[in-house]
């Protein structure tokens, strides 16, 4: 639910009000922000400003994302595509302005193979630099960029 907020990229402040990035960067230390909120026609997605340190297999990625902050997880395949699309609408610049990193790595989604009877060893990753979502072994090591549905 969007609550009549215009599509764009925002920073959630201490009381969880959404501040436009260009207003946020006027603060004394804009790098205190830990996340951005991507508002689209599909909803409001809160995204960590950088990948978690290290690499993870699929199960480790799910655990690490959940431990980042309450309510966080790896993105769905669809959210990963939304993040890629938003890179061309200012998402990477927003990350940089708050001391984060562009969303260009190869990262885990939250989605394993939907047919575990066929193959229980695979899951989906997204390639942030190109926007591809592909199938990969759950045992490979990839990045984690935690996300959450934004809640006020």
Residue positions per predicted region:
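An exposed tryptophan-centered "aromatic clamp" motif
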Residues: 58-73, 77-138, 147-152
């Amino acid at each position: 639910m969007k609550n009549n907020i215009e599509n764009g990229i925002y920073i959630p402040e201490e009381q969880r009000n959404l501040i436009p990035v260009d207003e946020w960067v006027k603060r004394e230390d804009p790098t205190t922000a830990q996340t951005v909120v991507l508002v689209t026609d599909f909803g409001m997605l809160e995204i960590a400003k950088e990948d978690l340190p290290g690499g993870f297999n699929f199960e480790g990625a799910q655990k690490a994302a959940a431990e980042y902050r309450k309510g966080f997880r790896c993105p769905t395949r669809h959210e990963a595509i939304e993040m890629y699309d938003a890179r061309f609408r200012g998402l990477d610049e927003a990350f940089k302005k708050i001391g984060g990193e562009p969303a260009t790595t190869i990262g885990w989604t939250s989605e394993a193979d939907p047919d575990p009877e066929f193959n229980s060893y695979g899951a989906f990753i997204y390639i942030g630099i190109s926007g591809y979502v592909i199938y990969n072994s759950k045992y490979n090591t990839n990045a984690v960029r935690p996300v959450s549905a934004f809640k006020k």
